[in-house]
């Protein structure tokens, strides 16, 4: 179906709760009865004031549907480990998974590629049929020897297991332990085979556990010369997918010392210094909450979740962070806010009249289905539907603080459901992932790819709001939408 610009401009006002509930029921009629009952638990309309979204989450997708989720391998390698710039990350298995994981997600960094940084390079054991039959441990060991010879300045190696490794039972832990002793540097095995768990969320957990067991805890007492200050913080869950250095910059402007960051533009020593932090600051809670809670329990380091999308949330987060420290930090936080306020005001003045009242449907992973809502609202836009690829119940609980009543909630939405909801609700903008991008554009909907800022960005941080506003305006108000028509029309 093609939606013209005229259709979008004449769409009805925000629907009431009963109408959206009817839309859910109508959409589910296309499914077999048993599956419809199962999917109904993942769809709901949020009622104002409730502390729950009342949707089931973190449950396996049903085989045969077009799910938007990724796998455990994507969560471990593609999200958490790959941005660690001075370690070599081996995709252990067939070449395809490693290629798409490496090429599909950006992670900006400072360094010389192939000398002291390796993020954009693809290292694979290139499993073949004979490796499935005879095992791949010897091949993995040989690969590590070659990498150590070719890249002696690397600070370590991680092994990211693909599906065949778990199926044939290779002992990557034994190989890693042996090579770590030979090389004198960490060699970290990750049992992140794609068939494990529900989604990429398990991969985050596996990566967090390997950081804890192989990097953080073993090095916790190896910093005798570390000079601590009262203002030491660690930045966690910030992956620098589009040059997102702004978060660190504004934290330093308010007087804090960022002693470690994980894992965007992060050297491996970042995690080893984290145990000395006075406060952990979480950007993406879902992907790093496991290691954060471990650090709270073992090292007594508290944490705060922050949101640097849009001026309203930036100011709110800065003041929350500053309240943990003394008055000098609180004063500097206010000075930082005052510094950027004119810039934010100018952005709102320019773009809000062009975007006021425009409706948005979100479906992303990690934090964006909730965190970006404030930035859209700063521009006068209204989020009418949102959901998580791999969210857990606590993600939806926190989202209730961001959304309004009558917002459509969809967990692990199927391709059919997402298209049907958009067709009926007629949003002015759909913000989701690369798999959805071209489908909705062919339907005539303006679209922004929110996993990697649609190859633009950054969208968060003090300077990111201007780019965010420009890109939303560029998508929504592009005259091409008045000319487009679905290819099958």
UniProtKB/Swiss-Prot annotation:
Binding site for [8Fe-7S] cluster: 71, 97, 163
UniProt keywords, alphabetically: ATP-binding, Iron, Iron-sulfur, Metal-binding, Molybdenum, Nitrogen fixation, Nucleotide-binding, Oxidoreductase
CDD domains found in the cross-reference section: Nitrogenase_MoFe_alpha (cd01976)
One matching Pfam family: Oxidored_nitro
GO biological process, any: nitrogen fixation
Assigned EC number: 1.18.6.1
Residues given in the record as [7Fe-Mo-9S-C-homocitryl] cluster binding sites: 284, 451
GO-annotated molecular function: ATP binding; iron-sulfur cluster binding; metal ion binding; nitrogenase activity
EC class: oxidoreductase
Record note on cofactor: Binds 1 [8Fe-7S] cluster per heterodimer.
GO cellular component: molybdenum-iron nitrogenase complex
Record-annotated disulphide pairs: none
Database matches in InterPro entries: Nase/OxRdtase_comp1, Nase_comp1_asu, Nase_comp1_CS, Nase_Mo-Fe_asu
Domain of life: Bacteria
Cofactor field: [8Fe-7S] cluster; [7Fe-Mo-9S-C-homocitryl] cluster
Catalytic activity annotation: N2 + 8 reduced [2Fe-2S]-[ferredoxin] + 16 ATP + 16 H2O = H2 + 8 oxidized [2Fe-2S]-[ferredoxin] + 2 NH4(+) + 16 ADP + 16 phosphate + 6 H(+)
Function: This molybdenum-iron protein is part of the nitrogenase complex that catalyzes the key enzymatic reactions in nitrogen fixation.
Family statement: Belongs to the NifD/NifK/NifE/NifN family.
Subunit structure: Tetramer of two alpha and two beta chains. Forms complex with the iron protein (nitrogenase component 2).
Matches recorded under PANTHER family: NITROGENASE MOLYBDENUM-IRON PROTEIN ALPHA CHAIN
Protein name (database record): Nitrogenase molybdenum-iron protein alpha chain
Organism: Acidithiobacillus ferridurans
Protein's gene: nifD
């Amino acid at each position: 179906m093609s939606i013209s610009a005229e259709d979008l401009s004449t769409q009805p006002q925000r629907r009431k709760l009963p109408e959206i509930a009817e839309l859910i029921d109508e959409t589910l009629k296309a499914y077999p009865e048993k599956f419809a009952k199962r999917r109904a638990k993942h769809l709901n309309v949020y009622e104002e004031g409730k502390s729950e979204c009342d949707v089931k989450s973190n449950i396996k997708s049903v085989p045969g549907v077009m799910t938007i989720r990724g796998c455990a391998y994507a969560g471990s390698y593609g999200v958490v480990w790959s941005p660690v710039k001075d370690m070599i990350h081996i995709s252990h298995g067939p070449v395809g998974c490693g290629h798409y994981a490496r090429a599909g997600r950006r992670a900006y960094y400072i360094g010389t590629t192939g000398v002291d940084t390796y993020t954009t390079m693809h290292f694979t054991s290139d499993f073949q049929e004979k490796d499935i039959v005879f095992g791949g441990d010897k091949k993995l060991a040989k690969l590590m020897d070659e990498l150590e010879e070719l890249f002696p300045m690397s600070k370590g190696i991680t092994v990211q297991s693909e599906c065949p490794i778990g199926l044939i039972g290779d002992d990557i832990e034994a190989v890693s332990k042996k090579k770590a002793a030979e090389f004198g540097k960490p060699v970290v095995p990750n049992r992140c085979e794609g068939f494990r768990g529900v989604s990429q969320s398990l991969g985050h957990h596996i990566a967090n556990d390997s950081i804890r067991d192989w990097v953080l805890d073993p090095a916790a007492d190896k910093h005798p010369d570390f000079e601590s200050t009262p203002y030491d913080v660690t930045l966690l869950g910030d992956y620098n997918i589009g040059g997102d250095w702004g978060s660190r910059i504004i934290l330093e402007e308010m007087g804090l010392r960022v002693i470690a960051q994980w894992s965007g533009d992060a050297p491996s020593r970042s995690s080893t210094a984290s145990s000395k932090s006075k406060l952990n600051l979480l950007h993406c809670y879902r992907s790093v909450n496991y290691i954060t809670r471990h650090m709270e329990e073992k090292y007594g380091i508290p944490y705060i979740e922050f949101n640097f999308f849009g001026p309203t949330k930036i100011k709110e987060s800065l003041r929350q962070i500053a309240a943990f420290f003394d008055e000098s930090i609180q004063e500097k936080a206010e000075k930082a806010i005052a510094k950027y306020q004119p810039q934010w005001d100018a952005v709102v003045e320019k773009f809000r009249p062009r975007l006021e009242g425009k409706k948005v449907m979100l479906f992303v992973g990690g934090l964006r289905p909730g965190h970006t809502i404030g930035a859209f609202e700063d521009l006068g836009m209204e989020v009418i539907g949102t959901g998580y690829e791999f969210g857990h119940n606590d993600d939806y609980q926190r989202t209730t603080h961001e959304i309004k009543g009558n917002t459509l909630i969809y967990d692990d939405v199927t391709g059919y459901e997402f298209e049907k909801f958009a067709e009926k609700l007629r949003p002015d903008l759909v913000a989701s992932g690369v798999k959805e991008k071209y489908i909705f554009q062919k339907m005539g909907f303006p679209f922004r790819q929110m996993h990697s800022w649609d190859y633009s960005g950054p969208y968060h941080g003090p300077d990111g709001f201007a780019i965010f506003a420009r890109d939303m305006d560029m998508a929504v108000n592009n005259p091409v939408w008045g000319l487009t028509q679905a290819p099958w029309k």
